[in-house]
Amino acid sequence: MQYNFKVEAFEGPLDLLLHLIHRYEIDIYNIPVAEITEQYLSYVHTMKELQLDVASEYLVMAATLLQIKSKMLLPKHEEDVLDNGDDFIDDPRQELMERLIEYKKYKQVATELKEREQERAQLYTRPPIDFTSLQQEEETNLPLDVTLYDMLAAFQKLMRRKKAKKPVTTRITRQEIPIEQRMTDILKQLEIQGGRQSFYDLFVDDEREIMVVTFLAVLELMKNQQIIIEQEHNFDEIFVSSYTKSA
């Protein structure tokens, strides 16, 4: 099965790092490089396993993290230590930390500008007959709360769960399902379930190839704004809803 899905349509490497910092409640001013590098590489590995079209920037960031990690493992000399003995003048994490803080500010400003733009759009005078349909259209185009990386984390968890339950002697029969067919199946399944269903319940088949196609179909439906992904709190169960249900 070959299917290329461009990751850039969702996020970038700095977004992934910010996601990990938020998900694991990491202090951005004191990043545990070994831990976050392991998590970052795990996500990139999953994206490559899914045959997503991973941008070169992700690999550059991976190399940067490994370089910082190796520097952090080097012995510290006395002249590198400040008078209080707690911090180091030449912290290998400094540049990355500054980039993350700057990028986080940029994202916050971009979000605020988008919200203001949506507010201004609602102030335009339109005939009353068209106002309701316009409002619904604006609501369906709001940004998704769940990111690609939340979805990858859920898929990793799902794969671990399926692997743990699967008998070692199980013989796998390879099946190839067109992603377009799986997208149609998911939309029909949502319709039967009243427009909303648990993300995990979409994966009724234990075969890895089918699970991958299902996950890619969900991403494509997200990108096409045919479904909404909802998660109330961090680490909570993820639900998939059709736009008609959420409107």
From Swiss-Prot:
Its GO biological process annotations read: cell division; chromosome segregation; DNA replication
**Sorted alphabetically, which keywords does the UniProt record give?**
Cell cycle, Cell division, Chromosome partition, Cytoplasm
Q: Answer whether the UniProt record assigns the keyword tRNA-binding to this protein.
A: no
Q: Name one GO cellular component term.
A: cytoplasm
Q: Where in the cell is the protein located?
A: Cytoplasm
Assigned protein family: Belongs to the ScpA family.
**PANTHER family, per the entry:** SEGREGATION AND CONDENSATION PROTEIN A (PTHR33969:SF2)
Protein's job = Participates in chromosomal partition during cell division. May act via the formation of a condensin-like complex containing Smc and ScpB that pull DNA away from mid-cell into both cell halves.
User: Quaternary structure?
Assistant: Component of a cohesin-like complex composed of ScpA, ScpB and the Smc homodimer, in which ScpA and ScpB bind to the head domain of Smc. The presence of the three proteins is required for the association of the complex with DNA.
Among HAMAP family, the record links this protein to: ScpA
NCBIfam families in the cross-refs: PRK00104.1-1 (NF000992), PRK00104.1-4 (NF000995)
Q: What is this protein called?
A: Segregation and condensation protein A
